[in-house]
From Swiss-Prot:
The gene is Svs4. Induction: By testosterone. This is Seminal vesicle secretory protein 4. Keywords: Secreted, Signal. It comes from Rattus norvegicus. The keyword Metal-binding does not apply.
Length: 112
């Protein structure tokens, strides 16, 4: 009796593991197809060269955006704060905020 129940439990475990493996393989192959199609088709015609569009078929949907967008905005703001601290107030192009203000004031004076 014990060996029969052990055999049935082993068989059940094997079937469940196989089913989970198949589902995972199907999901992986579908996501692989989506990635290969997006690389084959190239950037969408509606986007500019500077803009990257990423389709998000999966993931949480929240009104007013998704968690991923909020997290990326937070990361970019942290990154810009870190860059401004580490570069002594200058931006990526090497121009300080003081020089930018001075240039914009000069442009306003010229326009007036």
């Amino acid at each position: 009796m014990k060996s029969t129940s052990l055999f049935l439990c082993s068989l059940l475990l094997l079937l469940v593991t196989g089913a989970i493996g198949r589902k995972t393989k199907e999901k992986y192959s579908q996501s692989e197809e989506v990635v290969s199609e997006s690389f084959a088709s190239g950037p969408s015609s509606g986007s500019s060269d500077d803009e990257l569009v990423r389709d998000k078929p999966y993931g949480p949907k929240v009104s007013g955006g998704s968690f991923g967008e909020e997290a990326s905005e937070e990361i970019s703001s942290r990154r810009s704060k870190h860059i401004s601290r580490s570069s002594g107030g200058s931006n990526m192009e090497g121009e300080s905020s003081y020089a930018k203000k001075k240039r914009s004031r000069f442009a306003q004076d010229v326009l007036n």
